Regions:
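Long, terminal "pre-/pro-" and other extracytoplasmic accessory regions
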Residues: 1-193
């Protein structure tokens, strides 16, 4: 994405040359004591996205580092969570100020998609999940492929016998397993491996 870069008052920003969309913004500064809870930071991030014209997103994962809670949002296309179309928003946990915005995933990948009904039902896809795992949640998703494309999958949030959470992605067209991710939870948030 070609951008115009700006900097002032401890912040840097980039606006796309085509369309004038915000591509990224980062502010620096010393963070004070945490006064916000995650839900408050999430609310501020959602309101910020709406303010800049980015609506229709679902929060996915977050982590807090050096006083900033960075929340990942995926575009919601009908009932499909599009992980390919990601936006990140960072909220200062001491003041609620927006410290980070990254939209390049969304700007690079978002397009109007005409999703057809999945060839494989969610029940058939669930049969592919190992029976030793407890399925806690299921939803339709669009995930990136290693080759730069995208594939529509059912996402199964599962739990192992030792309470480790994992995500299993089953292709909604072929019924084959596409990917397995491990959820890494800590006091600072949740990341995937």
């Amino acid at each position: 994405i070609s951008v115009y870069r700006f900097s002032a008052n401890g912040a840097v920003a980039a606006i796309s040359c085509r369309g004038g969309y915000p591509v990224y913004m980062r502010k620096t500064g010393k963070m004070g004591d945490f006064i916000l809870e995650y839900r408050q930071a999430l609310d501020k991030a959602k309101r910020y996205l709406e303010k800049i014209g980015l609506a229709g997103f679902k929060e996915t994962y977050y982590f807090t580092d050096e006083g900033v809670c960075v929340i990942n949002f995926a575009y919601l296309d009908g009932r499909t969570v599009c992980y390919t179309d990601l936006v990140k928003v960072g909220v200062a946990m001491d003041s609620g100020e927006i410290m980070l915005l990254e939209t390049s995933g969304y700007l690079s990948n978002h397009t109007d998609r005409a999703f057809e009904s999945p060839a494989v039902t969610i029940e058939k896809a669930a049969e592919k999940v190992n029976k030793k795992l407890k399925i806690r949640n299921m939803e339709l998703t669009l995930i990136p492929t290693d080759s730069g494309g995208e594939v529509r999958c059912y996402e199964f949030l599962c739990e192992t016998e030792d309470e480790q959470e994992i995500l299993i992605y089953i292709n909604a067209v072929t019924g084959e397993e596409e990917r397995i991710l491990i959820l890494l939870k800590s006091d600072g948030g949740t990341l995937v491996k």
